[in-house]
């Protein structure tokens, strides 16, 4: 009997699958990589040997395995990470703001949050990358989460120089996080009287690289979508999107 272990769960092969696990993952990643909006379009392109409903259920089900693969890639990236790292978060709306009060699929996870672009209803994606753009850590939280409260748990296994924007400025965070092997450097606000050294300024100039990760995930890998009709569908979309980006 074939068994694929993902954490404490087992995907057991009892009755033969109409479509293999490898094909399920490949189709899901193809959808994200090519920016295809719906699973229906993928089904019509490849015409797999199963029903459309079976394909949708399988893609959502095996997102747990995709998440396991993603975590393995993150751990591998951590081993050879650059000393300079960037931490930031981005908004992931689950629906249009005008439809938020009627939204049901993600009502237990989505919350109202605010960014520099305005209000949104959904989640936040927090990530840490190194100077080479490799993903080192990630976490999904409700949209109203304070970035500073996530920072320490997100980067607990990492060392080096951590570059962050002004939203992470906190004396308590610096006191808690800074050690002999790691230090956080937050970009000062315009109204703050803080003098930067040349090397600090040079490091801060590299922070825009993490914005490219968010831009690519949203524009080219379908991170944001309001089409799923269930919690599993939404989280599967996020997992496959990030995994496809890491495998690019």
Describe each PLM feature range:
Residues 1-248:
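Short alpha-helical elements
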């Amino acid at each position: 009997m074939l068994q694929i272990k993902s954490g404490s769960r087992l995907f057991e092969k009892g009755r033969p699958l109409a479509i293999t696990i490898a094909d399920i993952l490949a189709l899901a990643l193809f959808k994200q990589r090519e920016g295809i909006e719906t699973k229906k379009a993928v089904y019509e392109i490849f015409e797999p040997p199963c029903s459309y409903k079976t394909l949708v259920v399988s893609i959502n089900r095996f997102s747990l395995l995709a998440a396991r693969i993603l975590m393995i890639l993150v751990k591998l990236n951590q081993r050879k990470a650059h000393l300079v790292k960037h931490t930031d978060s981005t908004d992931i709306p689950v629906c249009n703001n005008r439809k938020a009060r009627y939204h049901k699929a993600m009502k237990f996870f989505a919350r109202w949050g605010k960014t520099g672009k305005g209000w949104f209803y959904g989640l936040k994606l927090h990530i840490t990358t190194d100077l080479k753009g490799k993903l080192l850590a990630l976490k999904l939280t409700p949209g109203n989460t304070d970035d500073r409260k996530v920072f320490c748990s997100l980067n607990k296994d990492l060392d080096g120089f951590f570059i962050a924007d002004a939203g992470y400025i906190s004396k308590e965070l610096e006191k808690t996080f800074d050690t002999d092997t790691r230090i956080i450097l937050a970009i000062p606000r315009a109204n703050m009287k803080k003098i930067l050294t040349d090397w600090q300024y040079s490091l801060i100039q590299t922070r825009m690289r993490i914005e490219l990760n968010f831009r690519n995930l949203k524009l080219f890998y379908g991170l944001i979508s309001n089409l799923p009709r269930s919690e599993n569908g939404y989280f599967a979309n996020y997992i496959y999107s990030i995994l496809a980006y890491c495998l690019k």
